């Protein structure tokens, strides 16, 4: 149940279906196979006292156990995720000492450390300059190709997205207004 743009209560659609990784969402149980990168997720954490390594490792607490120390396997997973995004040499630096682009790459590493099948990103480049935004998109395309991770991103930057995405859906008022794919030359 939620509110529509007019402020009226709605229960949602009763027709159609939603599948995640080929499974009906109502029966889906493998939530650890999905990772999320928020919009400008580290904004305002300038004095947050955690290192890059600690931020990434936090996504492994389900695997490690709360209040337990990471073992060799988990430390290797963290290093591998940081290497994927080009941030391995920053692992001991405090997260608040990094640029916005570097922080977003750390959040991407945090999402990748679990080796997800689906990566969901919410406007991940909204706070980045042109150079860092382009680098971030190239990085996502590389990860998608090399790791075979499905990437689902919300963005208002259709021009840039169309250069990297295989498929694009334009939503308006909660409905698909336009759909385009690489095969039809419109993405």
Explain the meaning of each model-derived region:
Residues 94-98:
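Conserved ABC ATPase signature
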Residues 115:
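Conserved catalytic motifs of ABC-family nucleotide-binding domains
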Residues 119-122:
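Catalytic Walker B motif of ABC-type/P-loop ATPase nucleotide-binding domains
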Residues 155-156:
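H-loop/switch region of ABC-family ATPase nucleotide-binding domains
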Residues 168-181:
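H-loop (His-switch) and adjacent beta-strand-loop-beta switch element
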């Amino acid at each position: 149940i939620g509110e529509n743009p007019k402020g009226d209560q709605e229960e949602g659609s009763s027709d159609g279906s939603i599948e995640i990784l080929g499974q009906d969402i109502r029966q889906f149980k493998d939530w650890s196979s999905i990772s999320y990168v928020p919009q400008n997720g580290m904004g305002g954490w300038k004095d947050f006292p955690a290192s890059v390594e600690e931020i990434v490792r936090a996504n492994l607490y389900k695997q490690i156990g709360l209040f337990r120390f990471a073992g060799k396997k988990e430390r290797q997973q963290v290093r591998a995720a940081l290497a994927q995004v080009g941030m391995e040499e920053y692992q001991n630096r405090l997260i608040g000492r990094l640029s916005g682009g570097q922080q977003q790459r750390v959040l991407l590493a945090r999402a990748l450390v679990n080796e997800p099948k689906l990566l969901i990103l919410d406007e991940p480049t909204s706070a980045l300059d042109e150079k860092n935004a382009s680098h971030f998109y190239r990085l996502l395309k590389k990860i998608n190709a090399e790791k075979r991770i499905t990437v689902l991103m919300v963005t208002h930057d259709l021009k840039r997205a169309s250069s990297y995405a295989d498929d694009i859906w334009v939503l308006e008022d909660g409905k698909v207004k336009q759909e385009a794919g690489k095969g039809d030359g419109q993405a």
